[in-house]
Amino acid sequence: MSVAAGDKPTNSRQEILEGARRCFAEHGYEGATVRRLEEATGKSRGAIFHHFGDKENLFLALAREDAARMAEVVSENGLVEVMRGMLEDPERYDWMSVRLEISKQLRTDPVFRAKWIDHQSVLDEAVRVRLSRNVDKGQMRTDVPIEVLHTFLETVLDGFISRLATGASTEGLSEVLDLVEGTVRKRD
């Protein structure tokens, strides 16, 4: 088998994921029909479902990929810096709209919610490790448990993503992030 032929399934899978991300972001989970997924990916329904089985598994694959990517960025830079990056260059964070769809599915689909917990745990662990590391360095406040700081940052992130994805004004958001950072940092 040639190298090019060997690469084709991986490329096809990645092309499907990229097209599906655009489709879910534009039309939402419910609006991302098979026809729209075919158009967005440039692949047949047979190719799409060969790789992912069904629409839910395709969506979960996107969610898993996005959670892993975000966990990597969080572990290096912290969640507030991720939000600063989103504010400065929202196009780089194409997963924002998909994350909104994930939130909607979590509210309405208990089966999806059960499957999502494993994917979210990757991101949660990255945030906890980062917070713990910063506590050990003496940079974080210690009068509240790490879990409370984590929940606070996650809540801010969800609102931040919602605001950016819906096109609401970003005026003052940089100062809001300064406030968030000051809130979780050690007080002198």
Curated annotation (Swiss-Prot):
List each coiled-coil range: none
Q: Which residues bind Mg(2+)?
A: 181
- Show the GO MF annotations: DNA binding; DNA-binding transcription factor activity; magnesium ion binding; transcription cis-regulatory region binding
Q: Which InterPro entries match?
A: Homeodomain-like_sf, HTH-type_TetR-like_transc_reg, HTH_TetR, Tet_transcr_reg_TetR-rel_C_sf
Which GO terms of type biological process are on file? regulation of DNA-templated transcription
Query: Changing residue 66 to A: what effect?
Result: No effect on DNA binding
The consequence of inactivating this gene is: Deletion of acnR leads to a 5-fold increase of the aconitase activity. Overexpression of acnR leads to a 2-fold decrease of the aconitase activity.
Pfam families per the UniProt record, alphabetical: TetR_N (PF00440)
Q: Which UniProt keywords apply?
A: DNA-binding, Magnesium, Metal-binding, Repressor, Transcription, Transcription regulation
Q: Which cysteines are joined by disulfide bonds?
A: none
Q: Does the keyword Nucleus apply?
A: no
Q: Which Gene3D superfamilies match?
A: Tetracycline Repressor, domain 2 (1.10.357.10)
The family database entries (PANTHER family) matched by this protein are listed as:
HTH-TYPE TRANSCRIPTIONAL REGULATOR RUTR, HTH-TYPE TRANSCRIPTIONAL REPRESSOR RV1474C
Q: What does this protein do?
A: AcnR negatively controls the expression of the aconitase gene acn. Binds to the imperfect inverted repeat in the acn promoter region.
Protein name stated in the entry: HTH-type transcriptional repressor AcnR
**Where does this protein come from, organism-wise?**
Corynebacterium glutamicum (strain ATCC 13032 / DSM 20300 / JCM 1318 / BCRC 11384 / CCUG 27702 / LMG 3730 / NBRC 12168 / NCIMB 10025 / NRRL B-2784 / 534)
The organism's taxonomy opens as: Bacteria, Bacillati, Actinomycetota, Actinomycetes, Mycobacteriales
The gene it comes from is acnR
